[in-house]
Amino acid sequence: MEGFDLSLGKGLKPLFDDAPARFRRRISGVDYLHLKGRQSGDLFITRAGWPAASSILPERWFTGAQFSKPGQALAGATGAVYRVPVAHPVRSNFALVVKFSRFGQDVGITVAGNELTDDAEFMSRVDHAEFLPPFEEFGNLMRLRNQCGRHFATKAPLAIYSPPTRYLAWQLG
């Protein structure tokens, strides 16, 4: 098991704002607490994810080779996106949406219509399109949430996990 110390070496789990500075990161405008696992995996937990940290630990939903048995692929998702129920101390119906990042992979856009394909600059951007890294995805989502307020309901981004083992795309779904 990867194992992460949610007490941050303090014995009791601190409040997000009381975490020691050595654990704090701000990436793409989002605040994280960065925890290093015993097997060298990295877990970046957002302010929204910190209250549920014990439920979002990777050992709750990822066995190292696959999702825990109840996980299921989300229909219509682009990429490997799963809904995985996990145990939560207060909420009986708690589930995570887990997405494996395809950062740096080609997007594979198909463009229809002559007016678009005649624009060389546009087609150059399409030809070089890649998926964003997860930190940029979270940053963009948080900017969107902040600009739209309560008029735009989304799930809160909780954490980014980078396992110590690297996987090929086909191994992740």
Regions found by a protein language model. Give the residues of each.
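Juxta-kinase regulatory segment immediately upstream of eukaryotic protein kinase catalytic domains
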Residues: 2-72
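Conserved ATP-binding subdomain of kinase catalytic cores across diverse folds
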Residues: 55-173
